[in-house]
Regions:
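Substrate-binding/catalytic cleft of secreted carbohydrate-active enzymes
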Residues: 1-70
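Short, solvent-exposed loop/turn and secondary-structure capping segments
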Residues: 15-20, 39-44, 80-84, 223, ...
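Carbohydrate-binding surfaces of carbohydrate-active enzymes
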Residues: 31-36, 60-66, 73-303, 311-323, ...
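Short, glycine/acidic-rich beta->alpha junctions
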Residues: 48-55, 63, 192, 214, ...
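Short, surface-exposed tryptophan/glycine-enriched loops
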Residues: 123, 248-263, 335-342, 377-389
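Short beta-strands within extracellular/lumenal beta-sheet-rich domains
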Residues: 190-201, 329-342, 378
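Aromatic-lined ligand-binding clefts that engage carbohydrates, nucleic acids, or primary amines
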Residues: 207-225, 264, 339-362, 369-370, ...
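Terminal leader/tail segments of proteins
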Residues: 378-415
């Protein structure tokens, strides 16, 4: 017999009474008492709940009585490309989670104690019928705002693609979503970016590109001969335009100074997947789906090279021959900076001023940043740093800065 449990944040008596009605002879269990909530890109503020509201519901759960599991007690960080997403009925329907999973939990992203933690400790002790020896609390980690460092090298978009190994390149007559690509020993691509490239398309001065019978999952950037033709993403209203999941059969004007044979690149970023919902929710193939046609001036473009950009640690660490930094950025670019460390401490990158992308420290993927917020920092735990030289690589899609700035506090957004 399965033990049914409850998930909620408010109205504990109503929820637990309903649970007891379904299984009167079973113990009450709250499998997820939501201590806060996660944040999504484009939201105006960092989600929080008050200590008073949190404490009130927690005490009422234990008083009912029922057992409880906090979601979250410590949220931590969505390192790499592993952030999840939510869905909703209203626009924009799909909501990608930010990299920080601070969640306004009793322990912060860095493991620091909060007033919620102390309230939780007090309430649990009050209702604990068994005398328990409580160990000493671990010492809070020291945080350091290292001095800003200059960006010293870059690789342009074509240089990046030239460094992708043959086993991550696929020839296909039509476009294919990343999960079906014959990469990773035939297991497909799960995360990152996928590039659809055609080296010889005939472009007119005012050519039009159309995604027929499909859309982008989740964001598409179009380039002609390495020059970006799609706008920088800054607002949710743009999600209704060409380049995103909201609008099928969207069109883009490829305004060009001249006509001729060009290299067409369509770079698609997987923003993260949803892990719950109805059956239809779980069709979460990323990139450009099968049966999608790419039309240039109403003619289908066929014969693609599909390149998997997975940013695995070994590949990031292998990058070399960095060129000088250019002040004019026309396409997604990799940037290099070097941090000298005497003693590693926890720190944060302050990514305000950058556009959208991901950061790697000594090959480790810290996760995504995005100027849309609400979060503008990336957490670097001390164990990811080493005494001496640390290499920081930034993959920026839109707008770069000349420096990387550190802070000793997270920038999670207005509360």
């Amino acid at each position: 017999m399965v033990l049914q449990t409850a998930n909620f944040q408010i109205n504990p008596e109503d929820e637990l009474s309903l649970l007891k009605k379904f299984q009167p002879d079973k113990p009450g269990m709250v499998m997820e008492y939501w201590s806060g909530w996660f944040d999504h890109w484009f939201e105006k503020q960092h989600h929080t709940t008050s200590v008073e509201a949190f404490s009130d519901v927690l005490e009422r759960i234990l008083k009912f009585p029922a057992s409880v599991n906090l979601y979250m007690f410590h949220g931590g960080t969505n390192f790499g490309f592993h952030n999840g997403a939510n869905i909703q009925d209203e626009f924009p329907h799909y909501l990608a989670d930010v990299t920080s999973y601070d969640y306004d939990a009793p322990l912060t992203e860095t493991g620091d104690y909060t007033n919620k933690y102390y309230a939780c400790k007090h309430i649990v002790a009050k209702y604990n019928k068994v005398l328990t020896k409580v160990p000493s609390s671990p010492v809070v980690s020291k945080k350091m705002a290292y001095k800003p460092i200059s960006v010293t090298g870059q690789l342009n978009f074509n240089q990046i693609i030239d460094r992708i190994a043959p086993e991550d390149r696929t020839k296909s007559d039509s476009v294919v979503h990343m999960e079906k690509l014959p990469v990773n020993n035939g297991n497909g691509q799960s995360y990152g970016f996928v590039l659809y490239r055609h080296a010889e398309v005939a472009v007119r001065v005012n050519s039009t590109l159309q995604i027929k019978n499909g859309a982008f999952y989740d964001m598409g950037i179009v380039l002609l001969d390495g020059e970006r033709k799609t706008e920088k993403l800054t607002s949710t209203s743009q999600l209704l335009q060409f380049g995103y999941w909201e609008t099928k059969n969207a069109k883009l004007s490829l305004i060009s100074a001249s006509y001729g044979t060009r290299t067409l690149d369509i770079l698609v970023e997987n923003w993260g997947r949803v892990n719950f919902g109805v059956h239809a929710t779980f069709d979460q193939r990323k990139g450009l789906l099968e049966n999608t046609k790419i039309l240039l001036d109403d003619e289908e473009v066929t014969g693609w090279e599909i390149v998997s950009l997975q940013f695995k640690s070994k590949w990031v660490n292998s990058l070399d021959a960095w060129g000088p930094v250019s002040s004019h950025m026309t396409a997604p670019t990799l940037f290099l900076a070097t941090l000298q460390v005497d003693t590693p401490y926890d720190t944060f990158l302050d990514m305000r001023g950058w556009g959208r992308g991901a950061v790697f420290i000594n090959g480790f993927n810290l996760g995504r940043y995005f100027s849309a917020g609400p979060t503008h920092s990336l957490y670097i735990p001390a164990p990811l740093l080493k005494t001496g030289t640390n290499h920081i690589v930034v993959f920026e899609l839109f707008t770069a800065q000349a420096q990387l700035v550190f802070t000793d506090k997270p920038i999670l957004g207005p509360e």
